[in-house]
Amino acid sequence: PSFLGKKFDALLLDKKIEVINAGITGTTSIEESYRIKNELVDFEPDLFIVYGGINDVNLDLEKHLNHSKLETTIQKQLLTFTQIVLPEYKTTLLAPYALNHIITDLRNEDIITSSQEIDETNILQISSLWKDRWTEICDIGDEKEFKMIIILQPILGSGNKTLTGWEYEFLQTHGGDHNKTVYDKFATGLYDLEKSCDKVIDLRNVFDDHPEQVYFDSAHVTKRGNEIVANQIFNIVSPMVLEDIS
């Protein structure tokens, strides 16, 4: 969000375009859609950009169906404070969490960071539930006059990126090609979303032309990776935003 906001600021427009990061690391479409419906709409936004996918993939079907079993871990509570309570979100705020994770080998079950493969058993049903949640929010957007953009994030192994030695080794010990196959099946939920949402963006291939290291685990990316993603989102989203304010 910080990089995206700076790109809009650089346009030097007469009207202020404010990019606000309302996301919380580790959450799924369950929490995100709830917050949009019950909290964030009160701020009367013009546009929501939803960026995610992998946390839903790695959440088991039982928790998708029974939301009461979702627990708020200490990690999530701390991340909520650093990303929502603190006035600004910076990529570096993730550094202590990432470092602690690497050193202690903690496993947050909502994020792919272990050596286990993603469970493929119910992936199409999970994809359908994910799609249905965002379809509902997009329909609410039509009623309340805000736009919705849904973005499927890249993960290590998605697309056709030439991997660095470290990325390749990490991928082989954290699910390998199996995880890519499962993620590609999950991505089928994107197609029906195009019927309800203002725009649907698939970023699985966003790093195809970037052979340098951009991942530091299965889903999180470096500062350079965030810049690449922000540039791609800006190029796609800015025409829509500029048209709305003209």
Where are these regions (language model features)?
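Residue-level recognition of beta-strand->loop/alpha-helix junctions
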Residues: N21-G23, L152-Q153, D202-N205
